[in-house]
Amino acid sequence: MANVSNCEIPENLLYFIEGKNTVWAKQEAPDVIVVGITDIAQTMAGKVVKVRLKKKGTKVERGKPVATMESGKWAGPVPAPASGEIIDVNPDVEKNPVLVNQDPYGKGWLVKMKVNNPEELKQLVTGSAAVSKLTELINSEKLQCKRL
């Protein structure tokens, strides 16, 4: 795992990076991904106080929200890294939103999706390319990641 300015960047994950929006996807099967926000995103948001997840069965286009989040300094959507259908949600983050801050790559996962076209996942960045892109964002925002 890469660590840049205290921000953890697991190189085995796939990343959807659009401006300051950084979402990770973990492939569980060729057409199934688990989705969450990065350490960078949770640091930029600050303490997350509310998470609203789209319902199971919701069809989502790439870049459209799978969830919305609110913190003291930010409210906004969490974009889908690929088009597909939400097949599972993490009820724990709705009850205890700070999990997103405490464990963004583990207990703070948001939704599980069945991807329409697994080829679409090839558009996401991973490995050293992801570390490089996310390092640029960390540096441009002068970030020091921290967990709550």
From Swiss-Prot:
It comes from the Archaea. GO terms for biological process: glycine decarboxylation via glycine cleavage system. Its cofactor is (R)-lipoate. Keywords: Lipoyl. Binds 1 lipoyl cofactor covalently. One of its GO terms (cellular component) is cytoplasm. The modification N6-lipoyllysine is found at K73. Gene3D superfamilies: 2.40.50.100. The keyword Zinc-finger does not apply. Residues 32-114 form the Lipoyl-binding domain. The keyword RNA-binding does not apply. The glycine cleavage system is composed of four proteins: P, T, L and H. Belongs to the GcvH family. The glycine cleavage system catalyzes the degradation of glycine. The H protein shuttles the methylamine group of glycine from the P protein to the T protein. This is Probable glycine cleavage system H protein 2.
